[in-house]
UniProtKB/Swiss-Prot annotation:
Tryptophyl-tyrosyl-methioninium (Trp-Tyr) (with M-250) cross-link, chain position(s): W95-Y224
Full protein name: Catalase-peroxidase
Keywords associated with the record: Heme, Hydrogen peroxide, Iron, Metal-binding, Oxidoreductase, Peroxidase
Enzyme Commission number(s) of this protein: 1.11.1.21
Molecular-function annotations in GO: catalase activity; heme binding; metal ion binding
Organism (species): Rhodobacter capsulatus
Cofactor: heme b
Cross-link (Tryptophyl-tyrosyl-methioninium (Tyr-Met) (with W-95)): Y224-M250
Amino acid sequence: MDGKDKATGKCPVMHGAMTAAGVSNTSWWPNALNLDILHQHDTKGNPLNGFDYRAAVKGLDVGLRADLHALMTDSQPWWPADWGHYGGLMIRMAWHAAGSYRAADGRGGGNTGKPARFAPLNSWPDNVSLDKARRLLWPIKKKYGNAVSWADLILFAGTVAYESMGLKTFGFGFGREDIWAPEKDVYWGAEKDWLAPSDGRYGDLAKPETMENPLAAVQMGLIYVNPEGVNGQPDPARTALHIRETFARMGMNDEETVALTAGGHTVGKAHGNGDAKALGPDPEAADVTVRALAGRTRIWAARRRRPSPRGSRAPGPRIRRAGTWAISRCSSGHDWELTKSPAGAWQWKPVTIAEEAKPLDATDLTTRHDPLMTDADMAMKVDPSTMRSVRSSWPIRPPSTTLSRAPGSSCCIATWGRRRATSAPMCPPRIWSAGPGAAGPTGWDVAKVKAQIAASGLSVADLVATAWDSARTFRQSDYRGGANGARIRLAPQKDWAGNEPERLAGACGARTDRGGAGASVADVIVLAGNLGVEQAAAGVSRWRCPSPPVAAMRAAMTDGPSLTCWSRCMTASATG
């Protein structure tokens, strides 16, 4: 039966109209103001109906940690673990979630589980096979349900993976709440193709600092830099410059970058072992029946026997060997030469290396392979500044065994904001938590301060604009900015053109002089904004409820004076 055919008795249900690609309002009017993003955090889209996750997670069953430890060595036939341990995969999943964070606008990061679960990041080329990592976590998520969010589970899995391999971690803080749909307000770049050349992102590709803000990754579909080199052309010295800029845009310095890379690359391996054309569709394009197993290659059984190993020297990853292996690759006397992976990607291998020094095959422990370094790894060997960071930290703490947990923790925490927004006793008390400090003074005379502000001679515009300029810097993405701390009176905010520096200096100066009675400057700025709104609304009648009967309203609206009063009431309602 077909509802489109009226001549024969067929299905009366219309097909296609609701699924066909139509023309949206945005397509018709591309310059119209798009208000969709105002609804992306609407509670109506949350299926948990007011569930307070941050309160509930405080009672999380401690068995979660044991379950994750068990998962690490429970290799599944549909996606076997490298060396019998899923640690490398879980660490990559956690880091690619946290590492999408951008300091410039606070977007990305692992705060809501969005990079791992939703487009476009769930299908980026750099995130290939991470859907399998999430699928491995599914039995645990199903067991604990709402007691642990996807956002927390993904990052905690990375933490437990390191613990399972012998690393003592800094701790972990729970409390990240999931979102339920892709975000519409994140700019990932203007390119239309995955891995499009980097040139369009830079004013001058030779100067990494000219990358378009707020971007951090060098190409569409990558988390950081191209492992083969700038635009896929190996040149370690050139790549080093882009590494420094990209990781700086994530808030990391050279030492943290070295530690993070060494710690991650030591316990994992490269997987470019076959023809990319043999891969299936990415998760977002895959059939709904295989969404958790998308991208599997048709030659998987043969492909997994031909790995390009990277990192660990032992059949099972061992963090205790990480420093002697990963960092020695950069600082030892090995000479390296360019080669290509089975997939045709540029990489580096030792010119000579003893057989016993080669890492074991991930699946056949009787076979050894040459280790590899990406162009990004080689960049740290040839860059003098990076090597100074390696050598300065090595005598005190092997970067990949101790320090690697610091940048990983800092980037995971970067999207938390205030430490009090997190839960659980494992939360590390570090400065990364961006706490607002001690609470401001209380008990001061509000009426007295308001009177002083009113007598300052500042206009309504000064009062309201300064308060709004202070508050509007708040970023829900990483909880930075906002009125706390009155940072608007300090550099760089005091010099921003959008804050009208001359007007701002006068307003803050007047307010600070009259902020007696023990009030903080931050509180006085906000209070002054409230006073400005009150002054603007002074003398305006408030809306009365219930409204007059419709008939009486219609009669009144024919009268000119009534229309004027009506307008004033509507204005007061909007202002209030």
